[in-house]
């Protein structure tokens, strides 16, 4: 039944915004589409555009190097550029984030740099109009789909969980729940209720959540059968493609209606559409309680797909990334329900601590590999959609070059720390600074492409 759900409490607030397009002043340069100078005479021609979403802080600086030194010298692609740096999101009242998602729907492929999600400290630092929501959350709620995160395996990088001998892919449901919730602060005694008003005009339903004796906090969140079904189909299809078993984790023993709906929809879709293919591939699907699943993951050898609700996927993907070596070695791709629209991004944040060092003029050793893989996964998908084998080969070659560079002993400090311990590593003996590492990848890529 369609309808309108609202949260009622003793405290309410209204907010509005006006769209403006004043250019933002950034601490680092703003990078519009760059002139095509000094590029190779014969570049791979890409017929259709790719949406580029720029970001913040250290990753923004690295992103520019990747684009200008690793991608555009070899690939002739039209980039539909959107500056998602926090100052520009503030200048445009976050309209630029919405526009970038709509452009992704139009062109089917986007690559995204890491961005800041502001908290109170960031609001003060950037003098923001308001505490803007997560750009990733906004984009994902427009596009729908599932975020699949998988580790990049380098043979010489030891795992914190040595038993993980095979990759573990997390499928994160990128819609609703906490990321599209309405939350608020209660500053006095009062009743918090949820009210659902059916669209067909029938009587409203009301639930009493809590009778506040004093201040506190409240939240209302939602998800939809359509989105959960799309999530399920994506996960089952991905498991069949990988020939790995699939596990769905929820807390349906506590959230009997909410999480129970996830469990029921997955089971119905599996029984109706995928059980035969799973049996044929000798793989299986199971539902697990989230706490039981976390324990099982630590004891496993890997080699499975883990379907997580939105918040669980956000948290557990970072744990897996560190367990496999580093957040800098984790791919992240949002796959939409239509099967052709994707948005590829780095799984980590903007590396603020390194950016503060950069602002002081000090060299950093920041791992760019996840950001490089955002570009390669996006370009590879563009190649698959367009039937462009040269573009696919280029993306795969750049990925292999990154892995082989690390396996040859050239790496950033975070990876060297996995091998030797962070307190024991020395610059130029065990690791390279950011610029030198990127230059090494560039030289190795040129060599692999036969351009040296």
Curated annotation (Swiss-Prot):
Cofactor(s) this protein requires: Mg(2+); Mn(2+)
Its EC number(s): 1.1.1.42
Modifications the protein undergoes after translation, according to the UniProt entry: Acetylation at Lys-413 dramatically reduces catalytic activity. Deacetylated by SIRT3.
Positions bearing N6-acetyllysine: 45, 48, 67, 69, 80, 106, 155, 166, 180, 193, 199, 256, 263, 272, 275, 280, 282, 384, 400, 413, 442
Note on how the cofactor is bound: Binds 1 Mg(2+) or Mn(2+) ion per subunit.
Presequence positions on this chain: 1-39
Protein location: Mitochondrion
Protein name: Isocitrate dehydrogenase [NADP], mitochondrial
PROSITE patterns attached to this UniProt entry: IDH_IMDH
Binding site for NADP(+): 115-117, 122, 299, 349-354, 367
Role of this protein: Plays a role in intermediary metabolism and energy production. It may tightly associate or interact with the pyruvate dehydrogenase complex.
Sample GO molecular function, one term: magnesium ion binding
Catalytic activity: D-threo-isocitrate + NADP(+) = 2-oxoglutarate + CO2 + NADPH
Family the entry assigns: Belongs to the isocitrate and isopropylmalate dehydrogenases family.
Site residues (Critical for catalysis), renumbered to this chain: 179, 251
Matches recorded under InterPro entries: IsoCit/isopropylmalate_DH_CS, Isocitrate_DH_NADP, IsoPropMal-DH-like_dom
First-level EC class: oxidoreductase
This protein's record includes keyword Manganese: yes
């Amino acid at each position: 039944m369609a309808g309108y759900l609202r949260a009622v409490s003793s405290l309410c607030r209204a907010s509005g915004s006006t769209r403006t397009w004043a250019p933002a002043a950034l601490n680092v340069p703003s990078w519009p589409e760059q002139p095509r100078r000094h590029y190779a005479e014969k570049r791979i021609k890409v017929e259709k555009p790719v949406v580029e979403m720029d970001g913040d802080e250290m990753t923004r600086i690295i992103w520019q190097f990747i684009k200008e030194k690793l991608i555009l010298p070899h690939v002739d692609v039209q980039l539909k550029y959107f500056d998602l740096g926090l100052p520009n999101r503030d200048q445009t009242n976050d309209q630029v984030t919405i526009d970038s998602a709509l452009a992704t729907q139009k062109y089917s492929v986007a690559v995204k740099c890491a961005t800041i999600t502001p908290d109170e400290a960031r609001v003060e630092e950037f003098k923001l109009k308001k505490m803007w929501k997560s750009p990733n959350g906004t984009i994902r709620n427009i596009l729908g789909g599932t975020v699949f995160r998988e580790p990049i395996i380098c043979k010489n990088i030891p795992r914190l969980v040595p038993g993980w001998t095979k990759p573990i892919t997390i499928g994160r449901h990128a819609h609703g729940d906490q990321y599209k919730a309405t939350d608020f602060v209660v500053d006095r005694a009062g009743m918090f209720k949820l009210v659902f008003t059916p669209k067909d005009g029938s009587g409203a339903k009301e639930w009493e959540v809590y009778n506040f004796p004093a201040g506190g906090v409240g939240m209302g969140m939602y998800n939809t059968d359509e989105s959960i079904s799309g999530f399920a189909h994506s996960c089952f299809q991905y498991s069949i493609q990988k020939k790995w078993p699939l596990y769905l984790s929820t807390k349906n023993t506590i959230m009997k209606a909410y999480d129970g709906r996830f469990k029921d929809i997955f089971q119905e879709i599996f029984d109706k559409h995928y059980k035969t293919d799973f049996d044929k591939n000798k793989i299986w699907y199971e539902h697990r309680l989230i706490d039981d699943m976390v324990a099982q993951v630590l004891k496993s050898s890997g080699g499975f797909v883990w379907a997580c609700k939105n918040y669980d996927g956000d948290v557990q993907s970072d744990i897996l990334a560190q367990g496999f070596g580093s957040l800098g070695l984790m791919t992240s791709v949002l796959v939409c329900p239509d099967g052709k629209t994707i948005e590829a991004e780095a799984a980590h944040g903007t590396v603020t601590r390194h950016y503060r060092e950069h602002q002081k003029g000090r060299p950093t050793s920041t791992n760019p590999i996840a950001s490089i893989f955002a570009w390669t996964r996006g370009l590879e998908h563009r190649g698959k959609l367009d039937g462009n084998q040269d573009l696919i080969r280029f993306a795969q070659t750049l990925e292999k070059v990154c892995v082989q560079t690390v396996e040859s002993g050239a790496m950033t400090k975070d990876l060297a720390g996995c091998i030797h311990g962070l307190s024991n590593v020395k610059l130029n003996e065990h690791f390279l600074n950011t610029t030198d590492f990127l230059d090494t990848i560039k030289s190795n890529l040129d060599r692999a492409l036969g351009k040296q």
